[in-house]
Swiss-Prot record:
<dbReference type="GO" id="GO:0003747">
    <property type="term" value="F:translation release factor activity"/>
</dbReference>
<comment type="function">
    <text>Directs the termination of nascent peptide synthesis (translation) in response to the termination codons UAA, UAG and UGA.</text>
</comment>
<dbReference type="GO" id="GO:0005737">
    <property type="term" value="C:cytoplasm"/>
</dbReference>
<dbReference type="InterPro" id="IPR029064">
    <property type="entry name" value="Ribosomal_eL30-like_sf"/>
</dbReference>
<comment type="subunit">
    <text>Heterodimer of two subunits, one of which binds GTP.</text>
</comment>
<keyword id="KW-0648">Protein biosynthesis</keyword>
<dbReference type="Pfam" id="PF03463">
    <property type="entry name" value="eRF1_1"/>
</dbReference>
<dbReference type="InterPro" id="IPR005141">
    <property type="entry name" value="eRF1_2"/>
</dbReference>
<dbReference type="InterPro" id="IPR004403">
    <property type="entry name" value="Peptide_chain-rel_eRF1/aRF1"/>
</dbReference>
<dbReference type="Pfam" id="PF03464">
    <property type="entry name" value="eRF1_2"/>
</dbReference>
<keyword id="KW-0963">Cytoplasm</keyword>
<comment type="similarity">
    <text>Belongs to the eukaryotic release factor 1 family.</text>
</comment>
<protein>
    <recommendedName>
        <fullName>Eukaryotic peptide chain release factor subunit 1</fullName>
    </recommendedName>
</protein>
<dbReference type="InterPro" id="IPR005140">
    <property type="entry name" value="eRF1_1_Pelota"/>
</dbReference>
<dbReference type="InterPro" id="IPR042226">
    <property type="entry name" value="eFR1_2_sf"/>
</dbReference>
<dbReference type="Pfam" id="PF03465">
    <property type="entry name" value="eRF1_3"/>
</dbReference>
<dbReference type="InterPro" id="IPR024049">
    <property type="entry name" value="eRF1_1_sf"/>
</dbReference>
């Protein structure tokens, strides 16, 4: 799964968590079911059948019927699966109470975007989402290269585990004390061996950290006791895909395993903040386009959506808590459909639901958060979608100064050549 896919899937889970946490029901009619990857559907089905029998004895008629209904819905969801999916299965079923006091049935089932390590069955007056929150905890893999004048070590750190992938030693000639021609010759030989050593370090790094033309770690840490690490980072022979993933360069007192351990310790803060760093890099890339006035950038909801529909956007950047809604309405007389983009203050504007010419009531076809619509459709336009927070200085500036909505273009677009379809929103144009 690419970093981009993971970013979008994590946003979906965060959104789902917020929705589920806010939901409340009467009695114990809300079922949370989490099944581990290798657990048997048949075992869970039997457990639900037993639970159904137990719930049949609940004294309160209203609560009994609600619980039995939730168990039945859960059983129906399980019938959609012959076996537990590769990453496990999450099911939420039940009847919740809406803000206006009405009952609403909720039935959700999905395979998580990565293996889930929890088993859970709870029938309560709320949904339990701790297992989903665990999915959002980082399990990124970080690559380490420890390089000095004695050799190189390649390792990875993932969570609390570390692994040495490869190590090799080198015997580089020391500086020679002779003068004249001998000194020049030895200096040349020493530089040649040093260059060959760095080439081997760089080529081995490509072998270790690139799989199927994709970097297989979230970030790289270079460490060492001499200048080798800096030379490697700046060298043309170091794969640029890896160079772009360098998170930190640290000085360590040792090589080998001791150097690896020291490098992990010295880079711990950077590893914890890697998503923060990735976000800063992403937004800085957008700011650079703006500062250089390349014309290959866009911001503001209307122009950005125009560019998206034209297929001109390469990278779409969206603040994760954007509150804009996308509303599709239809004139029942003419059949004409129209799209409105509404800010939170405009979402109860009754004029949007009436034909401006005839005053006729318009039918609402769809109301979706714009973020949700983008998640469902961005791939149709060949764009990459990245959600960002406003927790970094760059993220905060992007949200406040650019409306939290913009993109980097594949090519320049002159928006004056295109009619603005909707200008109801977009104070950032």
């Amino acid at each position: 799964m690419s970093d981009n896919d993971t970013n979008v899937k994590q946003w979906k889970v965060r959104r789902l968590i917020a929705t589920l946490e806010a939901a409340r029901g009467n009695g114990t009619s809300m079922i949370s079911l989490v099944i581990k990857p290798k657990d048997e559907i048949s075992r869970i089905s039997k457990m639900l059948a037993d639970e159904y029998g137990t719930a049949s004895n609940i004294k309160s008629r209203v609560n009994r019927l609600s619980v039995l209904s939730a168990i039945t819905s859960t059983q129906q969801r399980l019938k959609l699966y012959n076996r537990t999916p590769q990453n496990g299965l999450v099911v939420y079923c039940g009847t919740l109470i809406t803000e206006d006091g009405k009952e609403k049935k909720v039935n959700i089932d999905f395979e998580p975007f990565k293996p889930i390590n929890t088993s859970l069955y709870l029938c309560d007056n709320k949904f339990h989402v701790d297992a989903l929150k665990e999915l959002l905890e980082t399990d990124d893999k970080f690559g380490f290269i420890i390089v000095d004048g004695n050799g190189a070590l390649y390792g990875v750190v993932q969570g609390s585990s570390r692994e040495v992938l490869l190590r090799f030693n080198v015997d580089l000639p020391k500086k020679h004390g002779r003068g004249g021609q001998s000194a020049l010759r030895f200096a040349r030989l020493r530089m040649e061996k040093r260059h060959n050593y760095l080439r081997k370090v760089a080529e081995t790094a490509t072998t270790m950290f690139i799989t199927n033309d994709q970097v297989n770690v979230a970030a790289l840490i270079l460490a060492g006791s001499a200048d080798f690490k800096n030379e490697l980072a700046q060298s043309d022979i170091f794969d640029q895909r890896l160079a772009s993933k360098i998170l930190k360069i640290v000085d360590v007192s040792y090589g080998g395993d001791n150097g690896f351990n020291q490098a992990i310790e010295l880079s711990s803060d950077a590893l914890q903040n890697v998503k923060f760093v990735q976000e800063k890099k992403l937004i800085t890339k957008f700011f650079d386009e703006v500062a250089q006035d390349t014309g290959k950038y866009v911001y503001g909801i209307n122009e950005t959506l125009q560019a998206l529909e034209m297929g001109a956007i390469e990278l779409l950047i969206v603040w994760e808590n954007l509150e804009t809604k996308r509303m599709v309405v239809k004139n029942p007389s003419t059949g004409e459909e129209k799209v409105f983009l509404n800010s939170p203050t405009e979402q109860h504007d009754e004029s949007k639901f009436k034909d401006p010419e005839t005053g006729a009531e318009l039918d609402v076809i769809e109301i979706l958060p714009l973020t949700e619509w983008l998640v469902n459709t961005y791939q149709n336009y060949g764009a990459q979608l990245e959600f960002v927070t406003n927790k970094s200085q760059e993220g905060n500036q992007f949200q406040k100064g650019f409306g939290g909505f913009g993109g980097i273009l594949r090519y320049k677009v002159d928006f004056q050549d295109y009619a603005v379809v909707e200008d109801d929103l977009d104070e950032f144009i």
